[in-house]
């Protein structure tokens, strides 16, 4: 009996070793798993919507511009057919483009007394963007059930063909920060000289405007169309009147401790035309009221905060990054109240921030090689790591599809992240040693970036590639994943290990019993 028991133990041991070998050799390294996940593109849109008395199961494939197939199941909340309904109306519209609702012909493809009625139709999204979808279940004995939802149709990053076009400055400069003025021109600061550059999007020509100072660093536009700038070495701010092209400057008062000079860095206009300036070395943010010619001081709550970037939300609050403490916060412009936010582990070099259409805050962690999304309502963080550990992500902006683009400072490529599909991609910059730090978007959502060492301004031309339906993978495709194999095997391994342990105790006692007898 003992001999037979040992044989069984040996066989089970070999099986367990085989399972361990399978799990070990079948696992990709952590980085490779992330790469595979990032490269996997799944097409399609699927949602469940409810009305007062009905449930709509909606699927759209491939969910891209062009021809799509829509499937709709209509049922009650228990997934039973609605007894007095066997017709459905589907309409699509695009109010932003003045496209009125267009009815989509729908046909019944499944009609059984025991399952919900399923309808199918063919709809065409003429272009990417936000579309309005209206679905109405027509009933004979009750009021119709209808649902309206907005759907964002956009290409995946792999379906966007990009081409970078560069324009060289007419003379040697150190272009830093670009700003779109809303009138088909990009304005660029120049830390190497007291001047502002204007780049015409119509003619692709440069113009420069000089003033009495030392440099221009960061730019903002107020509600009257003036473009303001910081001149850090001269401790002043200024603005250019876009009609007359005249530049006016204003000296910033000395701030304590006066043993060191002020270092004004970032600048941001609010909705009332006031100008906010971060003083990076004095732990202060200034509010300048042009009408009263008065500076007000906002003292940050922690020493060595090193306030850097500024931005404004839809309520008019001024947000800032505190590079020294790894935090960020907002200032109520009326009450002056400061609210600070931080992760359990402080952010690494937060040096730029901006808001998306949902009022989420995006923060570039300059030394943390990541961009981080912060939800101000839930106060939650989502971290997106960039592929290159040397990248130093910096300035950010959004394209017409809602993708977030970010500069990578010391790497000759710019990054783009699709927050709707959780996909990230890098676009190489042709110029070597470009040193790209900041970027902006024009009214068409076209990306523009500045190459400080390349002495160029660049843009990204994007062409949407049609989706080949026959070659795509949809959300309904079934695939055996590694975790689906590994999890049961690991569980079995734990169970068998426990059984081995119990059996070894039992065998030891039995052997002791035999020896003693």
What are these regions (language model features)?
Residues 187-192, 229-235, 275-281, 318-325, ...:
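Conserved beta-strand positions in repeat-built beta-propeller and related beta-rich domains
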Residues 170-182, 212-223, 255-271, 302-315, ...:
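Beta-rich, blade/repeat-based domains predominating
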Residues 21-29, 37-162, 239, 278, ...:
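N-terminal soluble domains immediately following signal/targeting peptides that reside
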Residues 200-204, 241-245, 288-293, 332-336, ...:
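Short loop/turn segments that connect beta-strands within beta-propeller blades
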Residues 493-508:
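Alpha-helical transmembrane segments
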Residues 508-517:
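Cytoplasmic C-terminal tails of single-pass
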Residues 429-489:
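Blade-level signature of beta-propeller repeat domains, shared across WD40, Kelch, NHL, RCC1
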Residues 158-172:
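A short helix->beta-strand "capping" segment at the edge of beta-propeller domains
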């Amino acid at each position: 009996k003992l001999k037979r028991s040992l044989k069984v133990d040996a066989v089970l041991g070999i099986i367990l070793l085989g399972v361990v070998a399978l799990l070990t050799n079948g696992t990709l390294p952590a980085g490779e798993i992330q790469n595979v996940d990032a490269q996997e593109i799944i097409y399609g849109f699927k949602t469940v919507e409810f009305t007062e008395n009905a449930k709509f199961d909606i699927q759209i494939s491939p969910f891209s511009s062009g021809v799509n197939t829509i499937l709709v199941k209509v049922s009650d909340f228990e997934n039973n057919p609605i007894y007095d309904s066997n017709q459905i109306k589907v309409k699509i519209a695009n109010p932003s483009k003045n496209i009125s609702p267009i009815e989509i012909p729908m046909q019944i493809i499944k009609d059984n007394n025991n399952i919900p009625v399923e309808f199918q139709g063919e709809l065409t999204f003429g272009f990417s963007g936000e579309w309005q979808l209206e679905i109405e279940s027509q009933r004979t004995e009750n009021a119709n059930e209808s649902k309206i939802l907005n759907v964002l149709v956009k290409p995946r990053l792999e379906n966007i063909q990009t081409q970078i076009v560069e324009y060289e400055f007419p003379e040697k400069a150190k272009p830093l920060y670009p700003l779109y003025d809303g009138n088909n021109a990009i304005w660029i600061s120049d830390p190497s000289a007291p001047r502002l550059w204007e780049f015409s999007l119509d003619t692709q020509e440069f113009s420069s405007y000089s003033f009495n100072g030392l440099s221009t660093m960061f730019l903002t536009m107020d509600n009257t169309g003036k473009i303001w700038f910081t001149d850090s070495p001269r401790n002043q701010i200024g603005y250019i009147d876009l009609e007359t092209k005249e530049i006016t400057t204003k000296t910033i008062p000395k701030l304590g401790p006066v043993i060191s000079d002020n270092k004004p860095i970032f600048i941001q206009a609010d909705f009332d035309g006031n100008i906010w300036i971060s003083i990076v070395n004095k732990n202060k943010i200034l509010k300048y009221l042009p009408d009263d010619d008065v500076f007000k001081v906002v003292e940050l709550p922690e020493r060595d905060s090193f306030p850097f970037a500024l931005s404004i939300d839809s309520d008019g609050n001024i947000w800032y990054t505190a590079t020294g403490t790894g935090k960020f916060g907002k200032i109520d412009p009326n009450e002056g109240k400061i609210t600070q936010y931080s992760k359990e582990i402080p952010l690494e070099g937060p040096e730029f921030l901006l808001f998306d259409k949902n009022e989420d805050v995006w923060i570039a962690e300059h030394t943390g090689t990541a961009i981080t999304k912060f939800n101000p309502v839930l106060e939650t963080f989502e971290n997106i790591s960039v592929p290159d550990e040397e990248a130093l992500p910096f300035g950010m902006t959004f394209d017409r599809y809602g993708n977030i683009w970010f500069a990578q400072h010391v790497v000759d490529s710019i990054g783009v992240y699709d927050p709707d599909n959780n996909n990230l991609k890098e676009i190489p910059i042709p110029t070597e040693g470009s040193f790209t730090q900041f970027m902006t978007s024009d009214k068409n959502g076209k990306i523009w970036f500045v190459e400080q060492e390349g002495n160029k301004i660049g843009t990204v031309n994007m062409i949407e590639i049609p989706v080949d339906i026959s070659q795509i993978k949809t959300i309904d495709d079934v695939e055996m994943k590694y975790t689906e194999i590994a999890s049961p095997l690991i569980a079995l391994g734990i169970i068998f290990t426990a059984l081995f342990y119990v059996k070894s105790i039992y065998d030891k006692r039995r052997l002791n019993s035999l020896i003693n007898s």
